[in-house]
């Protein structure tokens, strides 16, 4: 009984060494890192996806790729990646973002979040999981339909 995996968000950016120690103590299968991202073009750095912290209230100086590299060194396996700009909008998934993550970090089992609007979005994703909150709530499709796609695609990610 109990939780088999925990999700860690802002702590991974604010106290990366603490989270690295958690990986050492509990192992890679017990931890999922939340990578809530927003596009940024800071004056001093290059444009890209940056990790947001504090419930999406502030952008950190850490790029998504840097975040994944740092924790990849300790065996990062599970990531929940939310494109904040699309969360709750039902405007479609940022498949380009998720494909870039999967291509650059193939060992990661990625869960996508933000923008799901249709069954077509589920078909287009090649992630290991997806958050379908608002689309399901608004009745864009049924849970059975979404699960059928998941069952059919199982093992293809």
Language-model segments: residues:
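C-terminal helical cap(s) of enzyme catalytic domains, especially alpha/beta-barrels
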Residues: 19-26, 123-157
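Leloir-type glycosyltransferase catalytic cores
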Residues: 89-91
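Catalytic cores of alpha/beta
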Residues: 1-2, 17, 21, 96-130
């Amino acid at each position: 009984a109990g939780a088999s995996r925990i999700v860690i968000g802002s702590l991974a950016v604010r106290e990366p060494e603490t989270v690295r120690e958690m990986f050492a103590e509990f192992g890679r299968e017990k931890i999922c890192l939340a990578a809530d991202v927003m596009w940024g073009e800071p004056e001093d750095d290059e444009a890209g996806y940056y990790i947001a912290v504090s419930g999406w209230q502030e952008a950190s100086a850490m790029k998504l790729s840097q975040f994944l590299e740092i924790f990849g060194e300790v065996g990062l396996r599970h990531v929940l990646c939310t494109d904040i700009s699309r969360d709750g909008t039902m405007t479609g998934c940022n498949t380009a973002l998720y494909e870039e993550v999967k291509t650059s970090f193939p060992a990661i089992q990625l869960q996508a979040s933000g923008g799901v609007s249709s069954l077509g979005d589920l078909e287009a994703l090649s992630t290991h999981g997806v958050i379908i909150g608002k689309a399901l709530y608004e009745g864009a499709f049924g849970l059975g339909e979404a699960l059928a796609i998941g069952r059919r695609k199982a093992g293809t990610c």
